[in-house]
Structure formats: C-alpha cells, structure tokens
Amino acid sequence: MNKWGVGLTFLLAATSVMAKDIQLLNVSYDPTRELYEQYNKAFSAHWKQQTGDNVVIRQSHGGSGKQATSVINGIEADVVTLALAYDVDAIAERGRIDKEWIKRLPDNSAPYTSTIVFLVRKGNPKQIHDWNDLIKPGVSVITPNPKSSGGARWNYLAAWGYALHHNNNDQAKAQDFVRALYKNVEVLDSGARGSTNTFVERGIGDVLIAWENEALLAANELGKDKFEIVTPSESILAEPTVSVVDKVVEKKGTKEVAEAYLKYLYSPEGQEIAAKNYYRPRDAEVAKKYENAFPKLKLFTIDEEFGGWTKAQKEHFANGGTFDQISKR
C-alpha cells in the first residue's frame, strides 16, 4: 500500500473512532407519532451529514398533561414537544426547564400550528356543521379528558370561545353551552389518539372533536369512504410548543444536538415534514405551497379570549374550575 493509501486508511479509522453515537428522548403528546417518525429520520441524516455523529431519537407519546407530569417526576427527556405552553411551564416551574424557554425559539417556541375541527361519519348523518350542532339531543360526541390531554383543553376552549362570541361574551351562557356539549360526550379518553381510536376503530360516537392534523390523518389515510371533516365557522389557534429539558441535557451532555433537533423543525425540510403530516407550517413559502390543504376559518387565540394559558388553566382545568363544575352530574 502506498503512503496515500495508508494515510487514507488512518484518516477513515480516526473519523470512525471520533464519530459519536448519541441517543435523545423526545417526550411528546398523543397524535405526533407519525410526524416525529418521519422527522427523526430526516434530522438523523442531517446531523450525520453535518457532524459525522449518529443520533437515534426515541419517542414517548401520551396525553400532554400526563407526559409533562412524567418529565416532572424524572423521566429523562432531552426534549419535550407538547400540546400547549402550560404543560412546558409546569415542567419549568419544577426547575427542569429554564423559565424563559418560550423565548429561545421563533414564534414562542411553536414551530407549527393546528386548530380544532370535527370528524364525522360519511354522509354526515347527524348533519353536524358547527359547534351549536354538538349540543343537540341525540348527538354522541367523542373528545378526550381535559385533565390529562392537551388537545382536550384546546377542544374545550374552542367550544367556550364560540359560545362567548354567540352570546355577547356572557361567561355564564358560555358555561351552559359547554355543559350541554359535555352532557353529549359518550367517552372521555385520556389522550387525543385514544379518542380517535374510540371513534374510528371502535365505531363509537357521531362526531369526534379533534386536532385538525388528527382528523386529516384519519380521513385521508384511514378511510375517505368512511369519514368526513367538518370545519366549524370558527375555532382556536392551537400552538404546540417545544423545549430542551435543561437539567437532562446538561447531565447527559446532549445540549448541542438537542437544541439543533428543535431548531431543525423550523428549517424548510422540517416545515415540509410538518405540512405533510397535516400541521400548519410557520414558514411562509411552505405554507403557500400547502395552502389548499388547510381550510380557511376564523381563528382566535388563547391570549385574546382567555388571557393566556396560566389564567385559562386556573379558571377552567384546575381543581374546582369550570370543567369540574360542568362535570358534576
């Protein structure tokens, strides 16, 4: 072997030795399985190309509130990708995430958005067109439990906001409306994917209140001949949020790759993957490319209608809040 061949052999051997094997844990909310299965492959390839290191990302899924509790209780998540900011704040309150986490990434650390829509059976036999149809007698509604599910809290607040707008912002009338809606709920699963399975696989209910991405997944990939999506006249802008878990990445030495993992969600490839998985992308060019995939509707925000997540959580979902009040039979 000539000297160039020997040198190349040593170089390749040195590169092989220097390449690291890294493992991350992404603790996410219920219906993001398909999104992150695709995204993880793309990021791993990107990181390998950039650094030569091998990164494997493990996933954990469940109701967003339950997932936040698991991180608070010690599960060593490098990153969390949860349904709403309050759940990340809850982890930050326990000192595992920096309290200024929401400022670390663009768009308040929400790299994609969604909203809340209805999934009905083919032909829409109960003629469900808007939120007011969900309180009619004989309509069986499926939605998760707001005590454990982030999506369920978005569902609840979307209904509440609609009721406010149609009752001159009368909170008492909004509470009566939401109480009537939940009287029609047949099954309260712990997470959004569980509710989808109840509706789609078990055949229970006339209408599923769902994340838009979950409804599109069910309709487009599980049975266009079985289901239809109904987009209400208005709904809430749902903003799932992401953060590095500071205490864990500092302990494991994974901060650099964990931060890069979340930042890459904002890249053109990350945004494209989000859009293909039925999430509304933030990137203007990607959003324009997929604009026909997402119906236009009036969207209100958690800050506009409810004064932010801390206030909404306290008033509606804490012990003794409005959800507990309307749940009393």
Swiss-Prot record:
* CDD domains named among the record's database cross-references: PBP2_CysP (cd01005)
One Pfam entry for this protein is SBP_bac_11
Which key words are in the record? Periplasm, Signal, Sulfate transport, Transport
Coiled-coil region(s): none
Q: Residue span of the signal peptide, if any?
A: 1-19
Gene Ontology CC, one term: extracellular space
Q: Does the keyword Signal apply?
A: yes
List the GO molecular function terms: molecular carrier activity; sulfate binding
Q: Which InterPro entries match?
A: Sulphate/thiosulphate-bd_CS, Sulphate/thiosulphate_BS, Thiosulph/SO4-bd
Q: Give its localization.
A: Periplasm
Q: Does the keyword Flavoprotein apply?
A: no
Can you list the disulfide-bonded cysteine pairs? none
- Domain of life, per lineage: Bacteria
What are the recorded Gene Ontology BP terms? sulfate transmembrane transport; sulfur compound metabolic process; thiosulfate transport
- What conditions trigger expression of this protein? Repressed by sulfate or cysteine.
Q: Which family does it belong to?
A: Belongs to the prokaryotic sulfate-binding protein family.
- Sum up the protein's function in the record's words: This protein specifically binds sulfate and is involved in its transmembrane transport.
Protein's recorded name: Sulfate-binding protein
Provide the species name.
Answer: Escherichia coli (strain K12)
